[in-house]
């Protein structure tokens, strides 16, 4: 038990060992290479107090599954036509699924404990909760992007082959059994899914093992962003000086006197970066935004850097078309369900000196966020609330629910959307969404009662839906002082909430 505590208390970015090699170390290497194991039969005859069957996740249970999995591997290899033995194959896939889920849970323990302990030491847990809000990204963009010139819209690629993700973990995890077990899970996935082409293997694995894939994908993102942040900090104090972007896998090297000269091991050519003190980078899920006050040449160099980074360091090809460079204010980028832009707002001020008066024309860039109606209607159509033209449809699946449950579901969807899109500077699209959801709700109720929408609304009245479709500005009027904002002003202002920690499901459809 003291050894477990020692492994959990290890500090630093790299994790020397994880928990599960201590439990499975004598089995993983042999299992990965199909070598024989002397499994003791008494292993499967222990009482529940030891086996821990009453727990949701038991390390001993996973260890038994590995033993059984190896025994089935030996039996399957002895059968000429293994496709006919569907029962054994089904159990094998089930065992692999349980092992991969336990693998993902255990591998997250050191990182989660390290995060919680660091937050407790700094006593910034409340602030951290606020920073988790998606809307905090937009408040950052609103404050910074109005002073920038160029923006790069980047679709972050993901490795096509799962082996690339294992290689990334080699600089994090130093125990060999961990990598053997991970490769074993990937190998079984490929063997059991021959219908999936290699180009779609990563995507399929993300659907079958979402938790494990999320951990592997985050490790890939952390590594490439760590390299990017290092080069970004190095370029901030250099004067048009060239330096080879480092890419040694485990450590970053710098020479003395803050000269960022590094070993160029994985790049085929040297990239030239320029000084830029105003560069901002924001990422959420698989999309990132990089904005700068520099010139177009600088943005092209960073684009070339990203393409070469993915190609030479991570060994997979990324199309340059995944990175779009545009200039404000002639560009709008789509991010987290919002269509954002930095338009120039002209204004005039009257000035008077003695007896002479004159007008001063000024232009002020302002960060604006709007809701794009066409993708939003497409998302509602995908969820079967309307067709692609925006005409509301009934929800036959909900017709068997009670009237109050049906209205509550529609009302909750609208309130969540209105809450998420409170940062929009133009609320007309929200009124269109409200119209679609209200009429879809009315058609669902009319379908349930075998009546027409007109007759149903005449019998109950349009006020019947009002308490379920509460406007966001009415909620804001209860929160903010009425002397500061009127309802008309609130409809034109962007309001960001710090309690939104995930994207709305309908907004998620827009990124598919």
From Swiss-Prot:
**Signal sequence interval, chain numbering:** none
Q: Write out the entry's keywords from A to Z.
A: Chloroplast, mRNA processing, Plastid, RNA-binding, tRNA processing
Q: Which cysteines are joined by disulfide bonds?
A: none
GO CC: one term? chloroplast
Q: Which GO terms describe its molecular function?
A: RNA binding
Q: Where does this polypeptide localize?
A: Plastid, Chloroplast
Kindly give the Pfam families that the UniProt entry links to this protein. Intron_maturas2, MatK_N
Taking the first listed entry, what is the main subcellular location of this protein, grouped into a coarse class? Answer: plastid
**GO terms classed as biological process:** mRNA processing; RNA splicing; tRNA processing
Q: Which InterPro entries match?
A: Domain_X (IPR024937), Maturase_MatK (IPR002866), Maturase_MatK_N (IPR024942)
**Function as written in the Swiss-Prot or TrEMBL entry:** Usually encoded in the trnK tRNA gene intron. Probably assists in splicing its own and other chloroplast group II introns.
Q: Which family does it belong to?
A: Belongs to the intron maturase 2 family. MatK subfamily.
Q: State what protein this is by name.
A: Maturase K
Q: Which taxonomic lineage does the organism of this UniProt entry have?
A: Eukaryota, Viridiplantae, Streptophyta, Embryophyta, Tracheophyta
């Amino acid at each position: 038990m003291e050894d477990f505590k020692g492994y959990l208390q290890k500090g630093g970015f790299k994790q020397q060992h994880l928990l599960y090699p201590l439990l499975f170390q004598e089995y993983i290497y042999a299992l990965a290479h199909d070598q024989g194991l002397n499994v003791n039969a008494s292993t499967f005859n222990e009482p529940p107090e030891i086996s821990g069957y009453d727990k949701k996740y038991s390390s001993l249970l996973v260890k038994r599954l590995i033993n059984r999995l190896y025994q089935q591997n030996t039996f399957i290899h002895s059968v000429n036509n293994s496709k006919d033995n569907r029962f054994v194959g089904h159990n094998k896939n089930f065992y692999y699924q349980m092992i991969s889920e336990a693998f993902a849970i255990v591998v997250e323990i050191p990182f989660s404990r390290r995060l919680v302990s660091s937050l407790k030491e700094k006593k910034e847990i409340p602030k951290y909760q606020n920073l988790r809000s998606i809307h905090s990204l937009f408040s950052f963009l609103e404050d910074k992007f109005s002073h920038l010139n160029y923006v790069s819209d980047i679709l972050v690629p993901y490795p096509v082959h799962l082996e690339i993700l294992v290689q990334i973990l080699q600089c994090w995890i130093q125990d060999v059994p961990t990598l053997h077990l991970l490769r074993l899970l990937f190998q079984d996935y490929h063997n059991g899914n021959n219908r999936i082409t290699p180009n779609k293997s990563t995507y399929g694995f993300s659907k079958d093992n979402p938790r494990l894939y999320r951990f592997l994908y985050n490790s890939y993102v952390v590594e490439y962003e760590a390299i990017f942040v290092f080069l970004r900090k190095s370029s901030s104090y250099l004067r048009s000086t060239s330096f080879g972007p480092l890419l040694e896998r485990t450590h970053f090297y710098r020479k003395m006197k803050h000269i960022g000269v590094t070993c160029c091991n994985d790049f085929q050519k040297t990239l030239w970066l320029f000084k830029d003190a105003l560069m901002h980078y924001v990422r959420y899920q698989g999309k990132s935004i990089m904005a700068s006050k520099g010139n177009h040449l600088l943005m092209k160099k960073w684009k070339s850097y990203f393409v070469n980074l993915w190609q030479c360091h991570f060994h997979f090809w990324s199309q340059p078309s995944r990175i779009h460079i545009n200039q404000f204010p002639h560009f709008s980028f789509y991010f987290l369900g919002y269509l954002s832009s930095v338009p120039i707002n002209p204004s005039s001020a009257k000035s008077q000196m003695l007896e002479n008066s004159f007008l001063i024309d000024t232009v002020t860039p302002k960060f604006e966020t709007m809701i794009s109606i066409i993708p939003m209607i497409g998302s509602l159509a995908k969820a079967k609330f309307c067709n692609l033209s925006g005409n509301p449809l009934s929800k036959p699946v909900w017709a068997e629910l009670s009237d109050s449950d049906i209205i509550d579901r529609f009302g909750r969807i609208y309130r969540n959307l209105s809450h998420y899109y409170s940062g929009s500077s133009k609320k007309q699209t929200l009124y269109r969404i409200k119209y679609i959801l209200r009429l879809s709700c009315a058609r669902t109720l009319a379908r349930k009662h075998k009546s027409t929408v007109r007759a149903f609304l005449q019998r109950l009245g349009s006020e019947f839906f009002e308490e379920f479709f509460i406007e966001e500005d009415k909620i804001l009027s209860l929160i903010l002082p009425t002397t500061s904002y009127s309802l008309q002003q609130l409809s034109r202002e962007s309001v960001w909430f710090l309690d939104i920690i995930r994207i709305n499901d309908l907004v998620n459809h827009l990124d598919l």
